[in-house]
Structure formats: structure tokens, C-alpha cells
Curated annotation (Swiss-Prot):
InterPro entries in the record: Formyl_transferase-like_C_sf, MPG, MPG_sf
Pfam family, one: Pur_DNA_glyco
Protein name: Putative 3-methyladenine DNA glycosylase
Molecular function as annotated in GO: alkylbase DNA N-glycosylase activity; DNA binding
Family: Belongs to the DNA glycosylase MPG family.
Organism encoding this protein: Ehrlichia ruminantium
Database matches in CDD domains: AAG
EC number, as in UniProt: 3.2.2.-
Example GO biological process: base-excision repair
Assigned keywords, A-Z: DNA damage, DNA repair, Hydrolase
Cysteine pairs bridged by disulfides in the record: none
Classification via NCBIfam families: 3mg, PRK00802.1-4
Length: 188
């Protein structure tokens, strides 16, 4: 059995959630991957966040309940997966930027880039606004991994608010590519 992250986890401050997601496992249907990179987008003052321009049909999920998926399309071709954070009414989300896709064989595959993650896992806009705290086929779970070694850098792929060190990265994921899958929960 596996331990799905609860709403209370996502209700915390976004920067705490972003760093704490490192080493957790993203489950989507039959796929599972260890999260190795995240970025935080926080509030209406964050010029790089979709919420900067206020509440819209597109950003409504960011203002909603913590723990819900926020999936959108960029450049008309790439889907990006975020999970909503902070209390309802405050717009914030964490972008999942990189994972180690687990398989029965090693080395496991590094999937870097939010568009590549969604393409590999087949996540699309139809997976937007799903409660990831109550869905056993689309969720994030605890693992037995302790990730203490991570770095904070400016967010990438944006042109505004580049001074914020809100990107969290496990600097060397080589060991995770050879991780024993017994250290992570199994699907039941």
C-alpha cells in the first residue's frame, strides 16, 4: 500500500511544499516516478505566475483547494503538471519539472522538462482540476527516500520574476536512476 499526500501537506507554504516534494513519488495510472525538480508559483504578486493577472477561467483551479492538479498547455503543444498549494483562495501551485521514471529494470529513466513528463505519462488538460489527495491512480505519495541534498536556483523558462530562487533541484540524480524499487511504494 502507499501513503498518498494529504490536503494538509499541500495547504502549507508553497516553498515548503516545493522542497518537500523532492523524493516523493508521482503516480499516474501505471506510471510512477520520483520527483527530482520543482518550481513554485505563488500569489498574484508573482509576475511569472498565471495568477498574476487575477482570477480567470484558466486560473480558477489555482485559487481552489490545495492538492488539486493544475494542467495547462504552453506554446500550443506542451502540457505542464502543477499541484495547487496554500489555503483555498490564495493562488499558488508547484510545477513538476523533472522525475525519474521507475521501471522494472535499471537504470530508470530521467524525464526532464514538464512537457516531457506529461507526454511520457499521457497527462493532458483533461487531467486538470483533479483532487490528487483522493485519487489512487493520479496522486503523489510518500516514499522511504530522505532528500536532504537539494539546491535552490532561479526558475527557468520564464522572462519575469527571474530573481526568485523558487526552483528546487536534486543536483545529482544518478543514484536514483539505480534505486531499488522496494524503497518506494508499490501499486495495489
Amino acid at each position: 500500500m502507499y501513503n498518498i499526500l494529504k490536503k494538509s501537506f499541500y495547504k502549507q507554504k508553497s516553498l515548503d511544499v516545493a522542497s518537500s516534494l523532492l523524493g516523493k513519488m508521482l503516480l499516474f495510472n501505471q506510471h510512477k516516478g520520483i520527483i527530482t525538480e520543482t518550481e513554485a508559483y505563488i500569489g498574484q504578486d508573482d509576475q511569472a505566475a498565471h495568477s498574476f493577472h487575477g482570477y480567470t477561467k484558466r486560473t480558477a483551479v489555482m485559487f481552489g483547494n490545495p492538492g488539486f492538479s493544475y494542467v495547462y498547455l504552453i506554446y500550443g503543444m506542451y502540457h505542464c503538471l502543477n499541484v495547487v498549494t496554500e489555503p483555498e483562495g490564495f493562488p499558488a501551485a508547484i510545477l513538476i519539472r523533472s522525475i525519474i521514471l521507475l521501471s522494472k529494470n535499471t537504470p530508470h529513466t530521467k524525464v526532464n522538462g514538464p512537457g516531457k513528463i506529461c507526454k511520457t505519462l499521457h497527462i493532458t488538460k483533461e487531467h486538470n482540476n483533479i483532487d490528487m489527495t483522493a485519487n489512487h491512480s493520479f496522486c503523489i505519495c510518500n516514499t522511504n527516500l530522505n532528500i536532504d541534498d537539494y539546491i535552490c536556483t532561479p526558475r527557468i523558462g520564464i522572462s519575469k520574476a527571474t530573481d526568485k530562487f523558487w526552483r528546487f533541484v536534486i543536483p545529482d540524480v544518478t543514484s536514483l536512476q539505480y534505486i531499488d524499487t522496494k524503497l518506494v511504494p508499490t501499486l495495489t
